[in-house]
């Protein structure tokens, strides 16, 4: 009986202990957070790649229409409009990436656009460098691309796994937290000091201007993540648009982005674009990561090794971007003056003693702001010896040409 009764007994599984439950929950949460990080990183990489392609398409269109008389001829080309659509698509991808991954991961991934621009500029735009500059330019550029890729890999691998729902309550709670209020106080004081020295003391250093951009940019990315996260939650069914904090963040996002673009435009009028790209990337990324770590607590609970490896990835990406941008060709400024000896046929005119006459009926007076419609002056010719150019061996020395001497009629 006992054997039959014992045979009929079935072992019941024991309920899981609290330790096992917490372990399984933490592993599932870790897997979910890693998937969200991967989705956000892929969206950001895709967005920056598409933005790079779009900007190079528009650059290619402007290069082809450089000699056009119509200053807005690019509006009539399909290439420029395709670039504009790709630009909007890329920016939308970058905007959506902030809703999935931490801010500290998305911001440094803008190095992808620098890598893509360097490669597309060589292949698509066909930027040509002299063979003697190959070692100085190509090798350093490829080394920079390699370092930027390694840095990007470290950023994605050791990125923080903080994933808090961007609800109106959470954002309002972070906005009035003491760490962020202290950061805002320091940022506002520093911004006012830099703005004073820039506007009143003419401190036009690139570090001063780009620090202004970086401080504004840190607030831009904080508000972008809030707006993007609240929009994604609203699309998923958890409506967040009825919170006033959404509109506060939206207004701050637009305002800081506009002023940031203004300072960048002023910097581009003084400094080379490659220098702005490298210094701006370093300063803006550092300020944005700092703001994200304080506002969204990105690194709260992270291991020290992960934080150090993430910082190492940032430093490697900084070095890669610097190497890529430091050897770009500087734009040659437009030179409105033409050497007379460089014009075809001018040497033959000098040899024959032909006078170079100005066009008196033209509406443009070279070197003066006078109208040539009514001419009542008397011109008497004078002669000067021709100066032989050092670079021209075909010019004939000693042959005079006449320069018109201007005297008023009495």
From Swiss-Prot:
Disulfide bond annotation, renumbered to this chain: none
Domain of life: Eukaryota
Principal subcellular localisation of the protein: membrane
GO MF entries: magnesium ion transmembrane transporter activity
Membrane spanning residue stretches: 37-57, 80-100, 105-125, 139-159, 175-195, 206-226, 244-264, 275-295, 304-324
Keywords from the UniProt entry: Membrane, Phosphoprotein, Transmembrane, Transmembrane helix
Keyword Transmembrane helix (UniProt): yes
Region of interest (Disordered), ranges: 1-24, 389-410
Topology in the lipid bilayer: Multi-pass membrane protein
Subcellular localization(s) per the UniProt record: Membrane
UniProt GO cellular component terms: membrane
rRNA processing is among the record's keywords: no
Modified residues (Phosphoserine): 376
PANTHER family in alphabetical order: NIPA-LIKE PROTEIN 3, PTHR12570
Family: Belongs to the NIPA family.
Name of the featured protein: NIPA-like protein 3
Protein species of origin: Mus musculus
Classification of source organism: Eukaryota, Metazoa, Chordata, Craniata, Vertebrata
């Amino acid at each position: 009986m006992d054997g039959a009764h014992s045979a009929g007994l079935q072992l019941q599984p024991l309920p899981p202990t609290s330790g096992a439950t917490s372990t399984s929950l933490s592993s599932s949460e870790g897997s979910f957070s890693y998937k969200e990080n991967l989705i956000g990183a892929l969206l950001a990489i895709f967005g920056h790649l598409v933005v790079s392609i779009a900007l190079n398409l528009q650059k290619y269109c402007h290069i082809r229409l450089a000699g056009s008389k119509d200053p807005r001829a690019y509006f009539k080309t399909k290439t420029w409009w395709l670039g504009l659509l790709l630009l909007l698509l890329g920016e939308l991808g970058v905007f959506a990436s902030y809703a999935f991954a931490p801010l500290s991961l998305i911001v440094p991934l803008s190095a992808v656009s620098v890598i893509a621009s360097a490669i597309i500029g060589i292949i698509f735009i066909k930027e040509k460098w002299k063979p003697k500059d190959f070692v100085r330019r190509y090798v350093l550029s490829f080394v920079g691309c390699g370092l930027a890729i390694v840095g990007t890999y470290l950023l994605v691998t050791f990125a923080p796994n903080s994933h808090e729902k961007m609800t109106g309550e959470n954002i309002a709670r972070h906005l009035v937290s003491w760490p962020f209020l202290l950061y805002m106080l320091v940022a506002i004081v520093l911004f006012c000091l830099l703005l004073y020295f820039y506007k009143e003391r003419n401190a036009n250093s690139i570090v001063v201007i780009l620090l202004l951009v970086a401080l504004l940019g840190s607030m831009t990315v904080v508000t972008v993540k809030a707006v993007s996260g609240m929009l994604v939650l609203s699309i998923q069914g958890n409506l967040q648009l009825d919170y006033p904090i959404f509109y506060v963040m939206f207004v701050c996002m637009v305002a800081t982005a506009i002023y940031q673009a203004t300072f960048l435009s002023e910097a581009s009028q003084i400094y080379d674009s490659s220098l702005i790209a490298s210094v701006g990337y370093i300063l803006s990324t550092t300020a944005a990561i700092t703001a994200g770590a304080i506002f969204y607590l990105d690194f709260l609970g992270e291991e020290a090794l992960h934080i150090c490896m993430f910082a190492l990835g940032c430093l490697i990406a900084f070095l890669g971007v610097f190497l890529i941008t430091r050897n770009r060709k500087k734009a040659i400024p437009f030179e409105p003056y033409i050497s007379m000896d460089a014009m075809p046929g001018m040497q033959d005119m000098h040899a024959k003693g032909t006078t170079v006459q100005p066009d008196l009926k033209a509406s443009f007076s070279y070197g003066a702001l006078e109208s040539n419609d009514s001419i009542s002056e008397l011109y008497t010719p004078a002669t000067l010896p021709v100066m032989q150019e050092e670079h021209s061996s075909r010019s004939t020395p000693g042959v005079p040409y006449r320069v018109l001497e201007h005297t008023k009629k009495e």
